[in-house]
């Protein structure tokens, strides 16, 4: 692969300010949209008023914890974090299930399920290298396809 299109071959090169500012702004806007949208979808499924205090609170918490997780990823704390400029935030992977729980059981049950799933995810993180073979590309690809198909309507 040739790097003649960008002129950059070293990933440690800092682009000129005229390129860095628009690219950084684009990255921030993409991060903002991807962090806000799942909160809006889940709040709507829970029957919260658009722009109401509860929905605003969900969005604020999503942004706050995305910032904290990004700091953990960038700075690193002990063995946690890649120590690279990686943005962490909310995911669309859980939106279908969480919206269903919020619509039928309420927002409290939905958020409690997030805490329990987070603890399970944390526990699986220590053994992921030994169970990675259970998730071949076909399985992970089908999961991503199912997530995308759920978001169509």
Protein language model features and the residues they cover:
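N-terminal signal-anchor module of multipass membrane proteins
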Residues: 1-85, 93-101
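Hydrophobic alpha-helical segments embedded in the membrane of multi-pass proteins
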Residues: 60-71, 90-95, 115-122, 142-147
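Membrane-embedded alpha-helical modules
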Residues: 101-153
């Amino acid at each position: 692969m040739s790097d003649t299109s960008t002129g950059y071959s070293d990933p440690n090169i800092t682009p000129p300010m005229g390129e860095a500012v628009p690219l950084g702004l684009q990255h921030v806007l993409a991060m903002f949209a991807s962090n806000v949208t799942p909160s809006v979808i889940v709040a709507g499924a829970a029957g919260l008023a658009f722009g109401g205090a509860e929905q605003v609170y969900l969005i604020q918490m999503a942004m706050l914890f995305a910032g904290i997780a990004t700091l953990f990823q960038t700075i690193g704390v002990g063995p946690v974090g890649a120590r690279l400029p990686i943005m962490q935030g909310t995911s669309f992977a859980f939106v279908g299930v969480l919206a269903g729980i919020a619509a039928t059981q309420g927002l409290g049950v939905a958020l409690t399920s997030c805490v329990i799933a987070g603890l399970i995810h944390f526990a699986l993180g220590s053994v992921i290298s030994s169970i990675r073979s259970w998730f071949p590309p076909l399985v992970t690809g089908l999961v991503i396809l199912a997530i995308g198909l759920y978001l169509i309507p």
